[in-house]
Amino acid sequence: DLKELVETGVTPIMYYDAMGRLIKTKMPDGTLSRTEFDSWKQVIYDANDTVLESESSWYHNRTNHLIDAELIAAGKDPNREKMAADKAAKHARTPSIQHFDTLGRPVLLVDHNKNLVTDADEFYLTKVNLDIESNLRSVIDARGNVVMQYKYDILGNKIYQSSMDAGQRWLLINILGNPLRTWDERNHEFQYLYDILHRPTQS
């Protein structure tokens, strides 16, 4: 905890719970991030979310001009640093939340934002669909768009994917799981050849 040691280099202080999970990280600049664990969800607070908390000195030091001399010595403008602190405070208490299913898998992601004009809370939900073997089947964004969709063979190998941006793509693999042929809906096709020792020789 010596000031000279903490201020030299990057020395985050990390805290863990009894199960070995990272629950809090304190950074040398006074910012703080933490994670809350629950049976059905996980709440993630980044440095902006905790900026107004008593343990986070980053905002307090800049808005009250307590470290102006240090900032100037580091080539920074204290007034601009205060402006940055005030802007960061608008994002305070807006953690991200992951909701779990009965198998402990994340299936719903909630991004908590604030309207900069009205300061009203806004929540954006991303849904994740998994099959019984925990293979990712689809991702649906806050507007209801199917961003990604996947299909698998009986062994769990991915053989098809559909992207909202890149379109559809298929994959044919051999018995060892190595790709033999890939193609997409734009008629781009790739073939892969191997020698008798299953080393790639041509594509």
Task: State what each model feature region is.
Residues 1-203:
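Acidic, low-complexity segments
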